[in-house]
From Swiss-Prot:
Lyase found in the keyword field: yes
EC number in record: 4.3.2.1
Subcellular location(s) per record: Cytoplasm
Family: Belongs to the lyase 1 family. Argininosuccinate lyase subfamily.
Class of the enzyme per the UniProt entry, highest EC level: lyase
One GO cellular component term: cytosol
The protein's name in its UniProt record: Argininosuccinate lyase
Pathway the protein acts in: Amino-acid biosynthesis; L-arginine biosynthesis; L-arginine from L-ornithine and carbamoyl phosphate: step 3/3
Main subcellular location of this protein, as a coarse class: cytoplasm
Recorded superkingdom: Bacteria
GO molecular function: argininosuccinate lyase activity
UniProt entry keywords in alphabetical sequence: Amino-acid biosynthesis, Arginine biosynthesis, Cytoplasm, Lyase
Amino acid sequence: MALWGGRFTQAADQRFKQFNDSLRFDYRLAEQDIVGSVAWSKALVTVGVLTADEQLQLEEALSALLEEVRVNPQQILESDAEDIHSWVEGKLIDKVGQLGKKLHTGRSRNDQVATDLKLWCKDTVTELLSANRQLQSALVETAQNNQDAVMPGYTHLQRAQPVTFAHWCLAYVEMLARDESRLQDALKRLDVSPLGCGALAGTAYEIDREQLAGWLGFASATRNSLDSVSDRDHVLELLSDASIGMVHLSRFAEDLIFFNTGEAGFVELSDRVTSGSSLMPQKKNPDALELIRGKCGRVQGALTAMMMTLKGLPLAYNKDMQEDKEGLFDALDTWLDCLHMAALVLDGIQVKRPRCQEAAQQGYANATELADYLVAKGVPFREAHHIVGETVVEAIRQGKPLEDLSLADLQKFSAVIGDDVYPILSLQSCLDKRAAKGGVSPQQVAQAIDYAKARLA
């Protein structure tokens, strides 16, 4: 059933109809459309368009339809309706007859779809927040179990300074906490209802829009009808949040892909999140992580597409805005799936501590400690930096780590070096000295774990 047509003397070309129709993707707004329609029916009672009995009939029919949709949402796609609004109205008329045609009084699909989409976004943000916190908890648990797993930290993919696997996990907890904060901020801006703004100029009926917003679970009603039906900031904001969140997950995936290589060998992934090769029987591929990394580009593309769609649109509603949903649905679905998959990866991960320790002892990751030692002996840092660089060259020439050089060898580069240097060069000393807030010392890592656990409790 079309919601328009009186103005037209010819039927739409079937090719145009297929091009124009949006039911194949906006069917996902069915529950929100029905909930919004129930609230609108109540508002129409307050202005005398519907009687209380009529409203009750409509609400009962809409509630029945809501249950049918929850049981079998795919039934919607069997229809040739233009969009979800047409489908809901058609089904309502099937149930209550002519009374169903009164429901759209004073309402436009412009404020209707804006309301539906905001309701859907609120529901989806709640799911994303839950998945985000579940992943944070998984990272904190993994950190707690690996506080003593020493491994190399990297800059430029070169071994830099020793860290722990726990400290690495907690870095991603911080990123996910920022993602959580962004979603919570977005939820605040989402919490205003556009229903009752009509096509663009507001409704002609003196409906209490604040009361209507409350019925729908919004904190308040929007203040400008023209903006309300044109606004898709919430779509851009959530796509931006998803893009940033997926960048974090992509980096998480890339780190673990590297840690899982034969060359690094720091972790082993569970069989549950890996796959094999059709040709090479020895292969165990990190497909879950590679897909997380790959899907990041898909989400970034949705943000870029939506920015380009909106940038040249005049106020108020334009059909271009129908393009807001597919990218948003796909991006948030993808982000949600990747959050769940990242948690599953952690669930079965094995940290190979001996190999991590071995790698941390290689690559002269304790060179900074030697420089700090020289500074403590009164050598200016820039001079100490140069001395240690020369010392590393000598250690490489001899094929030894710094701590295996003889005292005589070390004193060739600085006479202030004494026997007390050797304890300083141990991995444990490297960790213990990083005791300022946010550092990798065991005490700081333990405090960070306790803080994260309390925040997530």
